[in-house]
């Protein structure tokens, strides 16, 4: 059984809550277990908890769940690009998948609501990657 850790952003929680629920349902559908869930203030705060989860022997992959909505500045782009870069670095450092279930940047609230399936897609990706890496 694949064991997943979720790191979930509280910012735009109405949207990340829906993303989390779809991710939970899909993990159960795929027969994966989610023994760890960590809430963080925002997407930019994800790297340290991701690192801690990746250090655990009973975590096969980490799922990130977040939503970054466009504002009046380029803040959304800076947040997502830097988080994605560091998340990828951690995946390579620990040799475990970290699936990007983060919607944004450059989207409106309405677009974000239409993208709540990103959490589900991240679970799908992580479970596939764990199984394929185990076969190498």
Swiss-Prot record:
State the superkingdom. Archaea
A biological process (GO) annotation for this entry?
Answer: riboflavin biosynthetic process
Query: Which reaction is this enzyme known to catalyze?
Result: (2S)-2-hydroxy-3-oxobutyl phosphate + 5-amino-6-(D-ribitylamino)uracil = 6,7-dimethyl-8-(1-D-ribityl)lumazine + phosphate + 2 H2O + H(+)
Q: A GO molecular function for this record?
A: 6,7-dimethyl-8-ribityllumazine synthase activity
Enzyme Commission number(s) of this protein = 2.5.1.78
Ribonucleoprotein among the record's keywords? no
Entry keyword annotation includes Transferase: yes
According to the UniProt record, one GO cellular component term is: riboflavin synthase complex
Binding of (2S)-2-hydroxy-3-oxobutyl phosphate, residues: 72-73, 115
| Pathway the protein acts in | Cofactor biosynthesis; riboflavin biosynthesis; riboflavin from 2-hydroxy-3-oxobutyl phosphate and 5-amino-6-(D-ribitylamino)uracil: step 1/2
The residues responsible for catalysis, as annotated, are 75
Binding sites annotated in the UniProt record for 5-amino-6-(D-ribitylamino)uracil: 11, 43-45, 67-69, 100
Which cysteines bridge via disulfide bonds?
Answer: none
Q: Which UniProt keywords apply?
A: Riboflavin biosynthesis, Transferase
Q: Which InterPro entries match?
A: LS, LS/RS, LS/RS_sf
Task: Provide the family line.
Answer: Belongs to the DMRL synthase family.
Under the subunit heading, UniProt states: Forms an icosahedral capsid composed of 60 subunits, arranged as a dodecamer of pentamers.
Q: What does this protein do?
A: Catalyzes the formation of 6,7-dimethyl-8-ribityllumazine by condensation of 5-amino-6-(D-ribitylamino)uracil with 3,4-dihydroxy-2-butanone 4-phosphate. This is the penultimate step in the biosynthesis of riboflavin.
Indicate what this protein is called per its UniProt record: 6,7-dimethyl-8-ribityllumazine synthase
**Organism annotation:** Methanococcus aeolicus (strain ATCC BAA-1280 / DSM 17508 / OCM 812 / Nankai-3)
């Amino acid at each position: 059984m694949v064991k997943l850790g979720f790191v979930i952003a509280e910012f735009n929680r109405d949207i990340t809550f829906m993303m989390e629920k779809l991710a939970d349902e899909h993990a159960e559908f795929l027969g994966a277990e989610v023994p760890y869930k960590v809430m963080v203030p925002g997407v930019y705060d994800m790297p340290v908890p991701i690192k801690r989860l990746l250090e655990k022997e009973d975590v096969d992959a980490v799922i990130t769940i977040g939503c970054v909505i466009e504002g009046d500045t380029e803040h959304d782009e800076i947040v997502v690009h830097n988080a994605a870069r560091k998340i990828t670095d951690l995946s390579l450092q620990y040799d475990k998948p970290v699936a990007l279930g983060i919607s944004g940047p450059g989207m409106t609230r309405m677009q974000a609501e239409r993208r709540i399936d990103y959490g589900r897609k991240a679970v799908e990706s992580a479970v596939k990657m764990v199984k394929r890496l185990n076969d190498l």
